[in-house]
Amino acid sequence: MKELKVSAINKGTVIDHIPSGKGLKVLEILNLPEDNTILVAINVKSQKLGRKDIIKVEGKILNEDEVNKIALIAPTATVNIIDKWEVVEKRNVEVPDEIVGIIKCANPNCITNYEEVKPKFKVISKKPLKLKCHYCERTMEENMVVKNLL
């Protein structure tokens, strides 16, 4: 018999297969409203990852920008949409080829940091993560990308 360590949700989103230790960062970048019930499991056993984190958000379906942010921090994550206690959609997150408006450029002289221009990055490499600013051509690696998520 399977043991459920984190209670099920009626309607919302489950973010599963987050690498162990990255769940709180995922939660932080999602900036969820206080009225959502949020369940977090950290460092639970996983056949796929050995250990993983899980986040369940009652009453919230993630938008594309939120899923893209998760992909930058936790590329092994899966996003499950729940309705009436059942998984109605399941998808693996994927780093897109181009990222617009969710990361601030690390170059203080970049036009995106002083004009009303949405930051835009081309993904040079997904593993390891490396992005290049469309405007100033500054490259950023994973640790800098995570620090500059909007």
Curated annotation (Swiss-Prot):
Source superkingdom: Archaea
Q: Which cofactor does it need?
A: Zn(2+)
| Note describing how the cofactor binds | Binds 1 zinc ion per subunit.
The UniProt entry's GO CC annotations, sorted and at most eight, read: aspartate carbamoyltransferase complex
Does the record's keyword annotation contain Zinc?
Answer: yes
Name the Gene3D superfamilies for this protein: Aspartate carbamoyltransferase regulatory subunit, C-terminal domain (2.30.30.20), Aspartate carbamoyltransferase regulatory subunit, N-terminal domain (3.30.70.140)
Task: Recall the GO molecular function terms of this protein's record.
Answer: metal ion binding
Q: Which residues bind Zn(2+)?
A: 105, 110, 133, 136
One GO biological-process annotation of the entry reads: 'de novo' pyrimidine nucleobase biosynthetic process
* Keyword list, A-Z: Metal-binding, Pyrimidine biosynthesis, Zinc
Q: Which residues form a coiled coil?
A: none
- PANTHER family reported for this sequence: ASPARTATE CARBAMOYLTRANSFERASE REGULATORY CHAIN
Q: Which NCBIfam families match?
A: ATCase_reg
Quaternary structure note: Contains catalytic and regulatory chains.
Function of the protein: Involved in allosteric regulation of aspartate carbamoyltransferase.
Give the family from UniProt. Answer: Belongs to the PyrI family.
Q: Which protein, by its recorded name, is this?
A: Aspartate carbamoyltransferase regulatory chain
What phylogenetic lineage does the species belong to? Answer: Archaea, Methanobacteriati, Methanobacteriota, Thermococci, Thermococcales
**Name of the coding gene:** pyrI
